[in-house]
């Protein structure tokens, strides 16, 4: 079921987890503790077992129109000409033949996930009604999964098309009439040029999504760690357009998914890098095949046509902790812990809503995902483990243990953020020119004071010129960490 992303019924809960009434009880308990529930809403597709798909197979035209069903191979070929493969290893192509429908059904991700036809107003109304139902159960944030794929236009790659923002703004306006506290979070893991469109540009400014994953920040952090050079990161983040003051980033270093190297070609060339070669280097480095690499990752979806090779792996294993522990290398362990803490401090320090993937705060390593036959064909499960609560207990009881050192480092950064008004979401982060290629520097200008942050992405001590800081700071300086 693609890890839960093939939804057969939007209005019921998986029976082993509970009921819709249990969901309402959960959200009430969370609200009482100041926690908002974020729910994935998979807007691009439904499971082939969904009632809409079953009715389409039964020949009901109303529901056939919920999907993109093509009659001939020539039609398929015309669309496929411009469409990339998302999962080339196990789901080649974007269409699947269905005998009952007697047609080719659009299925971007897997043959069991049928893409919805958002040009059909009935699909829009179905999802608006669903949002109202779930909001009445206490859901406050909808993570719009695969939002970048929902509009189809012949002759394009059918990603990031402008009609997406028309649809999203319309959904947002409608849901806020009945549930004004609801927020939208865009799952748009796209290139830097397309990313901020999901906040809204032009007439959509500030009227689309309230939060977006800062995919570019995540990619640039890992790129800088591999190269020990912040030049590309400085260039890429400096070009990030301003966002509406009513929106914010969701910052992260790892999540449930693979890492795709969305490095802009122009950014790479400006810093003297060949973009194709650099993406290949990053895949080699984080899969552990590059000489001297500290990482233990896995290649996910090797596409020989495009050269795209994404990476799976837990944050700690990608940051070098697994290899250092296995080789009994204390210095390597120290360096890996420093990387892990730095990554978390950076996502906390950039502003926005930091997302910490479960287990990363104590340094959980790659999971033995192949033991589960249902996961063996998808190595993304290497970073989707069951929580290791014994590591949490160790982190609290033994501050000098590896989990304890990581946890205390992350907690120190969290506490510093809590004390600092400069992290208000309306404040933009400004990347500043750094005189040292191993140190990224950014600032957060706030009416109560200007914050400057420095991140050393190398294993080595760096001497940083004090005059650079004096030119950016006020007379009275406070160190937060």
Regions found by a protein language model. Name each.
Residues 1-481:
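Active-site and adjacent substrate-binding regions of carbohydrate-active enzymes
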